Amino acid sequence: MSSQQFPRLGTPSPGLSQPPSQIASSGSAGLINQVATVNDEAGRDADVGTREHVGPSSSLPPREEKQEPVVVRPYPQVQMLPAHHAVASATPVAVTAPPAHLTPAVPLSFSEGLMKPPPKPTMPSRPIAPAPPSTMSLPPKVPGQVTVTMESSIPQASAIPVATISGQQGHPSNLHHIMTTNVQMSIIRSNAPGPPLHIGASHLPRGAAAAAVMSSSKVTTVLRPTSQLPNAATAQPAVQHLIHQPIQSRPPVTTSSTIPPAVVATVSATRAQSPVITTTAAHAADSTLSRPTLSIQHPPSAAISIQRPAQSRDVTTRITLPSHPALGTPKQQLHTMAQKTIFSTGTPVAAATVAPILATNTLPSTTTAGSVSHTQAPTSTIVTMTMPSHSSHATAVTTSNIPVAKVVPQQITHTSPRIQPDYPPERSSLIPISGHRASPNPVAMETRNDNRPSVPVQFQYFLPTYPPSAYPLAAHTYTPITSSVSTIRQYPVSAQAPNSTITAQTGVGVASTVHLNPMQLMTVDASHARHIQGIQPAPISTQGIQPAPIGTSGIQPAPIGTPGIHSAAPINTQGLQPAAMANQQPQPEGKTSAVVLADGATIVANPISNPFSAAPAATTVVQTHSQSASTNTPAQGSSPRPSILRKKPATDGMAVRKTLLPPQPPDVATPRVESSMRSASGSPRPAGAKPKSEVHVSIATPVTVSLETISNQNAEQPTVAVPPTAQQPPPTIPSMIAAASPPSQPAIALSTIPGAVPVTPPITTIAATPTLSAPVGGTPSTVLGPPVPEIKVKEEAEPVDITRPVSTVPPLATNTVSPSLALLASNLSMPPSDLPPGASPRKKPRKQQHVISTEEGDMMETNSTDDEKSAAKSLLVKAEKRKSPPKEYIDEEGVRYVPVRPRPPITLLRHYRNPWKAAYHHFQRYSDVRVKEEKKAMLQEIANQKGVSCRAQGWKVHLCAAQLLQLTNLEHDVYERLTNLQEGIIPKKKAATDDDLHRINELIQGNMQRCKLVMDQISEARDSMLKVLDHKDRVLKLLNKNGTVKKVSKLKRKEKV
């Protein structure tokens, strides 16, 4: 989001100057986003801050975690539109009057219909309206930030509110707040209990990363692909850049939705390309952009292909982002490539890591899908997503358009974590998320950090940074890329990109936590990225990335001077580092930071609240889908089985815990690292350690706490960091890492970064202590308190532990994290069906014994997600159950009211449960079938059967006979009535005279005959049935003779005793 803040113009000064103003505004806002950083942003920030922490403020104190604020970039998103109109509906939209030149940006906040409507009234406040950019020099750009607050209390709705990402402003805060708020995207995972976010719909996701990955497809997320809008601005990923790109070029775009066109337009203009995945609502504004909204609606299917109707370019394949004309700088959106969806429909790709390309600041040129230009060296970032083959899904990824993204050039060394395609397609959909939008900014950031060696990745995505040369450093507002989707649905940009981008950018918070490995957190990545990025810690933890910690981390590894830069000029170096952070968080991906987007569990660390501030973005990817995750590749390093056998939880939990506790920005990633990511680094365990994607890396990167400080505080960051920021974090990380072997890396990274602001806040991302952020200056707020809640850690992962740690993590919050954490903790608590934190993973038989014997229990599919869903639903259900029917009472009029319990319909099939066992009714070998030997019962055995005397009495026969008698009586009544009818009609006129009467007479006659026949046959059947009882006396005599003796004797014995 930050990107918006930075004037696309590339004026670096705004970015730099921003931080101070930002801080100021943040202070006022409490959670103000870093967003202020941008020129617009500054004005906006103040507004937003005031408006609501939710608003742009990054911090968004942990708003109802359930609520998922979605900041929607004004993209045309179909779904969102309606909501937009409703702007008032969900949250007050506070729009500060933007200068005329800006078209008014309207923050749209709407509760998402999808979402539970207003579970969190608070949410409403969250709207983030773009602040007038007046403060910034870039008036043209309209703060297009429309924030849609999705009140989604819906637990499952969209897993991730991707839209949030879109927050057009670049308010990181928006993003953050999204993350923070609820987006909780992080946990959007379906598993997540309903409350968390689930804004859009599914479970995953939602969260900063939401955009990147809607965790669930349920919600229809609309990815707003950039439409082909001519303007570059539009091209820009709207989400990120709205502000970023001055709207100037298309200031007034009207949005189709109610929202003031300006805003929308802004957004759209700004970012045409990046798709926003809105969780559900798309900004109407967007639509006004030309860009069609992309709907990444069904994750299941094409995995995200993001379809952007408007764009002719490879629709899903890639998005080309034109540079934003508005910006002075020619930032080309590299998005084009980014747009690709990574996954094919079905396959979820584990997050691919994206390595930021370290393009130099050169102007980015747009790249075609096929290749990425390096022109924009610094500016653009190439994100490499590598989809490791490891996951089978990876392939899918490839299939997706992602190819376009492939850019080999990228320096980044990212290895992408293996993509765990385990996630169902649904998940993958998310991935597409418009990472692009993040992309653009990120690139810039990245460039700043730039050049980290990149690990080879399979896919490289080019993430353009929007602000290429113009304001390379500052310009980057956010790095959109975070792939948080646990599913990896990462968009090229989104998922992995985030890593790279983020890492590149200031650590943008790439928190994409991809769940690649179910178990592993990519935590490491984040921290690495951070280092590399120099970015503070964008925790990139993407699980997915994990495999190559570097992958995501890849970027990280190369701390790239960023850290130095960081500390020195947070903005500069970070160039936005802070912003980046924020970006990171917001990252166009829409998931700020790491949403994990994994299906539902994304934690979206909405890292950094302010895009600009140096503060680290917290990204926390933490949660991974437990289910998905687990499925997903076991770990990079290890085979799935080891992960199953390994008792990962302890370490994971610990690592996470540690991480959380120590607030060190790097740690964020680090913590993750601890989890699995690290594994990439080298810890063997992580990789295989947990099959479940546990990733509760819950920590997001440090929150952006530093944001405030970022400007000069980088080194100081500690403030933000809370405990010793820079310095401490490294240690922390180490400790975290301790769990995972990779620690060294993260630690190093951290240490490297220390200076960098980002590093500092170790925010526990998950914990996302909004509080913290608030204090911090609002930017941190984004820290994602909400995400925290989202963060649901896999049980296996020992989510609880993690959670706990998170709670502890307050450091994150710097000071007040704890509340947030507490939420987080509660959220973290394991997903349903997860084992208790301490428990070791379920051990599965090594060999399938018998087809049938090993089948799942009745009515459960092996891959059934019922358990997960039940958790989310359970909360709702419980609430409803609490409203138990009132007891019997008599009202004033003497009417007696008796509670009626709905009883299940009576059906013969009630006791017939057909297990979902494919082999249940089929036999493959003769030995599967045994003829049951009939043994003749002895009279004595029969006599001793329970209730035999009752049966002998023939009560069933009598009952049946009585019913047959009733049938004959009914038939007799009908016969009588037909007779009367016939006599009444026919005699008056001769039947032969009228054809109609004749026909009626024949029909009556026929019915009378049928009645007679039925009566006769039923009576006959009844009589013959009762003959069975003719022998009753003899039978009873025999039974009493043979069976009674023993029974009587036994009873007598008992009586005697």
From Swiss-Prot:
Cross-link type Glycyl lysine isopeptide (Lys-Gly) (interchain with G-Cter in SUMO2), placed at K794, K873, K878
A Pfam family that the UniProt record links to this protein: SAP130_C
InterPro entries registered for this protein in UniProt = His_deAcase_cplx_SAP130, SAP130_C
Superkingdom in the source lineage: Eukaryota
Where, per the database record, does this protein carry Phosphoserine? S416, S439, S864, S884
What the entry says about post-translational processing? Acetylated. Sumoylated with SUMO1.
Q: Where is this region: Disordered?
A: 1-69, 619-695, 718-740, 827-873
Q: Please cite one Gene Ontology biological process associated with this protein.
A: negative regulation of stem cell population maintenance
Region Interactions with SIN3A and HDAC1: list its residue ranges. 845-1057
- Any one annotated GO CC term: nuclear speck
Could you tell me where the Polar residues compositional bias lies?
Answer: 14-28, 620-641
Q: Where is the composition biased (Basic and acidic residues)?
A: 41-54
Question: In this chain, where does the modification Omega-N-methylarginine occur?
Answer: R206
Summarize subunit and interaction data from the UniProt record for this chain.
Component of a mSin3A corepressor complex that contains SIN3A, SAP130, SUDS3/SAP45, ARID4B/SAP180, HDAC1 and HDAC2. Interacts (released by dead or dying cells) with CLEC4E.
Which named protein is this?
Answer: Histone deacetylase complex subunit SAP130
Gene, per the UniProt record: Sap130
